[in-house]
Amino acid sequence: TANNWMHMMWAGSNANEYYMSFRLQNNTQVGTITTNGSSTTYTTSSDYRLKENVDYTWDATTRLKQLKPARFNFIADDTNTLVDGFIAHEVSSVVPEAITGEKDAMEAAVLYVEGDELPSGKSVGDVKFPEQIAAQAIDQSKLVPLLVKTIQELEARITALEA
């Protein structure tokens, strides 16, 4: 959005080290992508100084039980490889912060790039572009705290039952 920006720079003494920083308008860093030539790291800022209203008492087990892991293949995958995952719009009611996009959204297919030649006498506004799926996506990392908290809750229940 207009309130956010990305900063990219080369960092470090090694020419193969790259750094990309994502920041809010007030310059608060919210994430980075770094690489050193042999690995890439994607991070989301998690510093306590950036947070408020911290609550450690929420019920993760109840929320986790609402998720429906599925096994499926992607239509565009000619190999029909089965993968484990989730359906984004189903997850959105349980962990909305993990989902981007809108259910059933469509967008114009990008067929024109500036500099491409258009049909004679036509301008970009005259050209009708076919629609394509504007796919929803899941940030799987947003599910990890739910998993950890559920394990802690279940461990506490086991300990209580064994006592």
Q: Model segments located where?
A:
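Trimeric beta-solenoid/beta-helix "fiber body" segments of extracellular/virion adhesins
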Residues: 1-48, 59
